[in-house]
């Protein structure tokens, strides 16, 4: 379906939605300041009504949801039996329905899996994109839109990142966290409200920002995302996603054993790093670009952006063995550029359990 934002002056769109309106850096600044709203055409909405919805989602996912209060935002992961991330979603409940906001590329697979896992429980997950869209911004910015209220409660998800949620665990050891000042929320709106937003922007009554601005602010906050930062091997530990998407003290769910083992007894095999890229040529690496130490490839870029204050930045996943002070380079279309590494997940992440060490008896002593 054609975007309602396509006719706006300067609008640049692709299949994911509105990328920008001609000034991505200005849009970033205004979005961060609470002066702009971003249409999130790359998101999808899944509705999960039914009396058993929260206990059912709790049993299937990494998050504790049974006692989730209406209007409180959290996020969940669906893991495979080996603990790898398969799906991710933001979730807010209105007292009658759990509303999942997902990356559009993940929505079909997540919905199919949820429908397969219903059994005889009182749940009925369905795609809700025909009825609803998603817009994002600071909490104050979203006061300019009218969220959907199907059960009388506004459908607004407030991003918990980077605070460590109950039952979570943060690996990034920096203080303050670069996302500490990030104020981000997403509102589910009706399609009529989406059209009103577009009309208000065309009339100059509302300022919009595109997805390019949204992603740059996300990368600067070290915030992982399914579309860009998850591959078939991704563990939540590697992305510091344990802080908001995993509850370590809840009941059993698929993949929990691996989550607990890596966190308590081992180390994640890879780790997320933030990169400050050489900005002399303003060339950004593409998704999947090689990260190197010397000539050896030690990881890949997952997200890259041109930030309005920090310049060219990126997130990358590298081997755990890469030294925290290693000199890194990144492949680009114009050649190799240097990259200064900032540690997000340290090499010693995990192994949090205090395992008692028993004195070892010699063979002679044990034989006596």
Residue ranges and their predicted role:
Residues 1-74, 79, 83-86, 368:
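Acidic, proline/glycine-enriched N-terminal capping motif
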Residues 50, 100, 137, 255, ...:
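Residue-level signal for inorganic ion chemistry
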Residues 70-73, 152-169, 222, 227, ...:
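Glycine-centered loop/turn motifs
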Residues 240-246, 256, 260-368:
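Glycine-rich, small/acidic residue-mixed loop/short-helix segments
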Residues 187-276:
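Anionic-ligand-binding alpha/beta catalytic cores of soluble enzymes and soluble regulatory domains
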Residues 36-37, 45, 90-224:
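Acidic, low-complexity central loop/insert segments
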Residues 24-33, 72-88, 118-121, 162-175, ...:
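Short amphipathic beta-strand starts and helix->beta connectors
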Residues 47-52, 137-141, 276-285:
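Short, surface-exposed ligand-recognition loops at beta-strand->loop->(often short) alpha-helix junctions
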């Amino acid at each position: 379906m054609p975007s309602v934002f396509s006719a706006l002056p300067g609008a640049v769109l692709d299949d994911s939605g509105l990328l920008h309106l001609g000034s991505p850096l200005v849009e970033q600044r205004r979005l961060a300041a609470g002066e702009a709203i971003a249409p999130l055409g790359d998101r999808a909405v899944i509705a999960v009504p039914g009396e058993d919805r929260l206990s059912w989602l709790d049993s299937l996912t990494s998050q504790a949801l049974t006692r989730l209060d209406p209007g409180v935002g959290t996020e969940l992961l669906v893991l495979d039996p080996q603990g790898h991330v398969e799906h991710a979603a933001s979730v807010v409940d209105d007292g009658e329905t759990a509303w999942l906001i997902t990356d559009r590329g993940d929505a079909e697979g997540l919905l199919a899996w949820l429908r397969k896992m219903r059994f005889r429980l009182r749940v009925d997950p369905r795609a809700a994109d025909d009825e609803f869209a998603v817009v994002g911004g600071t909490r104050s910015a979203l006061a300019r839109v009218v969220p959907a209220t199907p059960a009388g409660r506004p459908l607004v998800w407030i991003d918990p990142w980077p605070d460590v949620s109950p039952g979570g665990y943060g690996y990034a050891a920096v203080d303050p966290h670069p996302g500490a000042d990030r104020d981000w929320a997403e509102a589910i709106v009706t399609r009529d409200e989406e059209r009103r937003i577009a009309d208000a922007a065309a009339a100059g009554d509302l300022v919009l920002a595109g997805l390019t601005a949204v992603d740059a602010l996300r990368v600067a906050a070290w915030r992982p995302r399914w579309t860009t930062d998850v591959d078939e091997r991704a563990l939540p530990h590697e992305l510091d996603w344990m802080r908001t998407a995993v509850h370590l003290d809840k009941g059993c769910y698929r993949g929990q054993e691996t989550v607990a083992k890596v966190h308590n007894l081992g180390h994640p095999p890879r780790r997320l790093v933030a990169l400050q890229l050489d900005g002399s040529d303003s060339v950004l690496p593409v998704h999947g670009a090689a990260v190197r130490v010397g000539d050896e490839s030690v990881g890949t870029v997952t997200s890259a952006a041109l930030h309005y204050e920090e310049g060219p930045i990126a997130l990358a996943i590298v081997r755990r063995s890469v030294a925290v002070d290693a000199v890194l380079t990144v492949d680009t279309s114009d050649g190799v550029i240097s990259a200064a590494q900032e540690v997000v997940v340290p090499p010693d992440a995990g192994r949090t359990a205090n395992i008692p060490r028993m004195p070892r008896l010699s063979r002679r002593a044990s034989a006596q």
